[in-house]
Amino acid sequence: MNGFVNWYTASVKRSPRLTNGIMTGSLFGIGDVIAQVGFPEKKGQKYDLARTVRAVVYGSLIFSIIGDSWYKFLNQKVIVKPGKHWTNTAARVGCDQLLFAPVGIPMYYGVMSILEGKSLVDAKKKIEDNWWPTLVTNWYVWPAFQLINFSLVPVHHRLFSVNIISIFWNAFLSFKNSISPSDKKVPVNFPPVPE
C-alpha cells in the first residue's frame, strides 16, 4: 500500500489532471459495475458496458477536474479564522455540503442523461425526481467523512480519498440514475436509503 501511495503522490504532483482523471474515472466505473452486478434493477438484467463507460467518462473528464479544483479552492479560500484548524475545517465541510453538493448532484444526473442520449427535458425530469432524495442521502454520508478528509488528508490527496469512499456512493448514484421515473420501488436487495 505504501508503494502505491508513493507512486500516486509522485504522479499527482507530476501530472495532477491526468492522474486524477484516470483515478476518478476508474473509481466511478468500479462504482457502476458494483451497482449493475450487485444491485440490478431487474432480475436477469445483463451488464451494460456503455453505462460503465459513461460513468468513467463523467468521472474522468468532468468530476475529476471540478472536484480537484473545488478541494483546492476550499483549502486556499475558505479560511474563517487563520490558525483555527477545526473552525476552518467545519467551514469547509459546510461549504462542501451546502454549496457543492446541491449543485454537483443535479450536474451528475443532467450530464449522465445527456450522455445516455436523452433530451434536456428528460434530463430536467431526472434531476427533479432525484435531486432532493439524493441530496438528503448525501448529508447522511458525506459530512462526517469530509470532516476527516479536510482535517487529516493533504489537499493533493483529498480527491483520491473521496474517490475511495465514492466507490459506494457512485454505486448508489449509478443505481438511482438507472431507475426510470416509473420505477418507484427500490428492490429489497438494495440497502434502504432515506427518500
Curated annotation (Swiss-Prot):
Membrane topology: Multi-pass membrane protein
The UniProt record lists the keyword Transmembrane helix: yes
UniProt name for this protein: Protein SYM1
Single GO cellular component term: mitochondrial inner membrane
Subcellular location, record wording: Mitochondrion inner membrane
Keyword Membrane: yes
Role of this protein: May be involved in cellular response to stress. Required to maintain mitochondrial DNA (mtDNA) integrity and stability.
Species whose genome carries this gene: Kluyveromyces lactis (strain ATCC 8585 / CBS 2359 / DSM 70799 / NBRC 1267 / NRRL Y-1140 / WM37)
Ranges annotated as spanning the membrane: 21-39, 55-71, 98-115, 159-175
A Pfam short name: Mpv17_PMP22
Similarity comment text for this entry: Belongs to the peroxisomal membrane protein PXMP2/4 family.
Keywords carried by this UniProt record: Membrane, Mitochondrion, Mitochondrion inner membrane, Transmembrane, Transmembrane helix
